[in-house]
């Protein structure tokens, strides 16, 4: 899909480990049958004093969208017009959000040819045309959610687009760092979706993501959304800022698959469940893997003990990813020691921060005049990329 490889330019964080569990279906004997396809990707990297930790959970059949979004976001943050330690927190929040939205726009631009071709094939009304449309639909259905933690010295920023979680904890307290999960039962999402004239129950989760173009840009083709005032699924993220509490010892990021699996087995307080199950192992990676394995066992045990007539627990377990970050015990003091060198290192790049983005040339003249023509043309001609 392009734009790959930006991630590989930066070193990995040694304070973090990643654990994963594949999705599976339970057989009639209630044994898990693993699905070998893994749709998500994750990162733990740094560029000088800026650390990034992120999980990108792909859905609807492929990991290409998740990989693209992860790599492109790294470029947006560290590449041209980078985020730097000299920015004030409110500026970082604004830039973090804007750069994620740039990624969403870039993704749409990369799929312009497919969307254009799809409109042409729809008019053919032939078997060949229908087959081509089905193939394109399979591609443009792919999407990804994202949860990204960025640490700049003692400031912590959480970007969430979807239904994953970031949690901070010590031996006594647990703090959920992102307050909203973008699901159809979230009060804020219910208000947003109802305001579009849509019944929230007709919108499958997640209600925010990048990609999923049939619901974000071709939504009027769906019967339940044909009279909607706007798309039921959007790519606008939430970005929240907080100071790192010196008492925090751990950060944990959990994918939407973890959240869904735990909800299915009726875990009411997911952050507390995470803190109870977190046991430090020999390495950060083994700690992360042990944590996600414990979630997998919990789901399997609940399914195994359920009655055959109990349909509350699905025979499908979602794939899961956990990132575990071990914070230094004297984290705040270490940050102050790094601060002066961070300022001098990043000053030279900060001068380019406020350069305006250029508007790309996009040829939209061959778009067919369907329902989405004016909307797609306006979107592609007016939004910036890179």
Curated annotation (Swiss-Prot):
<protein>
    <recommendedName>
        <fullName>TGF-beta-activated kinase 1 and MAP3K7-binding protein 1</fullName>
    </recommendedName>
</protein>
<dbReference type="GO" id="GO:0051019">
    <property type="term" value="F:mitogen-activated protein kinase binding"/>
</dbReference>
<dbReference type="Pfam" id="PF00481">
    <property type="entry name" value="PP2C"/>
</dbReference>
<dbReference type="GO" id="GO:0001714">
    <property type="term" value="P:endodermal cell fate specification"/>
</dbReference>
<comment type="subunit">
    <text>Interacts with mom-4; the interaction enhances mom-4 kinase activity.</text>
</comment>
<feature type="domain" description="PPM-type phosphatase">
    <location>
        <begin position="22"/>
        <end position="327"/>
    </location>
</feature>
<dbReference type="GO" id="GO:0004722">
    <property type="term" value="F:protein serine/threonine phosphatase activity"/>
</dbReference>
<dbReference type="GO" id="GO:0030295">
    <property type="term" value="F:protein kinase activator activity"/>
</dbReference>
<dbReference type="InterPro" id="IPR036457">
    <property type="entry name" value="PPM-type-like_dom_sf"/>
</dbReference>
<comment type="function">
    <text>Involved in the Wnt signaling pathway by regulating mom-4 kinase activity.</text>
</comment>
<dbReference type="GO" id="GO:0045814">
    <property type="term" value="P:negative regulation of gene expression, epigenetic"/>
</dbReference>
<dbReference type="InterPro" id="IPR015655">
    <property type="entry name" value="PP2C"/>
</dbReference>
<dbReference type="GO" id="GO:0046580">
    <property type="term" value="P:negative regulation of Ras protein signal transduction"/>
</dbReference>
<dbReference type="InterPro" id="IPR001932">
    <property type="entry name" value="PPM-type_phosphatase-like_dom"/>
</dbReference>
<feature type="site" description="Required for interaction with mom-4">
    <location>
        <position position="364"/>
    </location>
</feature>
<dbReference type="GO" id="GO:0031435">
    <property type="term" value="F:mitogen-activated protein kinase kinase kinase binding"/>
</dbReference>
<dbReference type="GO" id="GO:1902531">
    <property type="term" value="P:regulation of intracellular signal transduction"/>
</dbReference>
């Amino acid at each position: 899909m392009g734009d790959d490889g930006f991630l590989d330019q930066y070193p990995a964080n040694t304070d973090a480990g990643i654990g994963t569990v594949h999705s599976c279906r339970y057989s009639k004997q209630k044994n898990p049958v693993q699905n070998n396809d893994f749709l998500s990707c994750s990162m733990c990297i740094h560029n000088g004093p800026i650390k990034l930790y992120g999980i990108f959970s792909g859905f609807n059949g492929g990991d290409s969208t998740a990989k693209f979004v992860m790599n492109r976001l790294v470029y947006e943050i560290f590449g041209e017009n980078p985020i730097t330690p000299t920015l004030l927190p409110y500026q970082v929040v604004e830039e973090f959000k804007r750069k994620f939205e740039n990624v969403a726009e870039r993704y749409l631009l990369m799929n312009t040819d497919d969307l254009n071709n799809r409109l042409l094939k729809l008019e053919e009304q032939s078997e060949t045309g229908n087959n081509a449309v089905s193939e394109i639909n399979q591609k443009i259905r792919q999407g990804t959610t994202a949860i990204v933690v960025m640490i700049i010295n003692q400031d912590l920023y959480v970007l969430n687009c979807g239904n994953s979680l970031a949690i901070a904890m010590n031996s006594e307290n647990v703090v959920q760092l992102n307050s909203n999960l973008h699901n159809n039962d979230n009060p804020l999402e219910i208000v947003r979706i109802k305001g579009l004239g849509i019944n929230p129950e007709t919108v499958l989760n997640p209600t925010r993501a990048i990609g999923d173009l049939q619901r974000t840009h071709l939504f009027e083709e769906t019967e339940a959304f044909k009279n909607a005032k706007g798309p039921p699924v959007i790519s606008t993220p939430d970005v929240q800022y907080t100071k790192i509490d010196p008492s925090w010892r751990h950060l944990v990021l959990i994918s939407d698959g973890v959240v869904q699996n735990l909800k299915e087995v009726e875990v009411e307080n997911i952050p507390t469940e995470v803190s109870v199950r977190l046991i430090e192992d020999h390495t950060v990676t083994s700690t992360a893997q042990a944590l996600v394995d414990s979630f997998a066992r919990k789901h399997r045990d609940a399914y195994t003990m359920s009655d055959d007539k109990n349909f509350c627990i699905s025979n499908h377990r979602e794939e899961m990813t956990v990132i575990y970050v071990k914070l230094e015990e004297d984290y705040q003091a270490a940050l102050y020691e790094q601060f002066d060198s961070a300022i001098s290192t990043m000053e030279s790049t900060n001068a380019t921060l406020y350069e305006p983005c250029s508007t790309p040339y996009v040829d939209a003249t061959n778009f067919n005049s369907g329902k989405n023509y004016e909307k797609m043309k306006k979107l592609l001609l007016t939004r910036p990329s890179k």
